[in-house]
């Protein structure tokens, strides 16, 4: 039986991406090869407890919610993450995966909504992006940019404009917490008429940076 190292499981309101606002079970896996400057889950880098797939499916069943988000850290850093995602889909859950743009997402079960967080220059990890991931995203997925400054915004805007074909995935622009004002980002998007969604971290407006919320 495959096992995964898990930092925490909890039910909260999904604060980001397409399922924002829904009661959601979060399964936060341990470990991440990246060190983004704005990371708000550094506590997931180390520690954690080993859990079997069956144990995590029991957690999902007992949560009594239909949305499950597998997050990290970087969940794809654990090979058994792919098995977990498929098992959750097979059990009838609406499943999303929060992942960086640094690891291959092509093997993720197509029933999963992949939320790919492409790293900007000021994240400190922009050189780790696997840009080939953009070519496998579908309308079921989301591409997220967490923006630390006007320069980050312009980088993301130009990357999108330079593509020969528009991305089928939804594109989300999110202000880095405490670094870019949401109102400023909204003004930039409107001024450029960008076909992107403004995203704020709803859970932080509700509960701040409290772990497990």
Identify the function of each model-found stretch.
Residues 77-213:
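Conserved AdoMet/S-adenosylmethionine-binding subsite of the radical SAM
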Residues 1-30, 34-38, 190-199, 204-208:
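Flexible, acidic/Gly-rich N-terminal and inter-domain linker regions that tether
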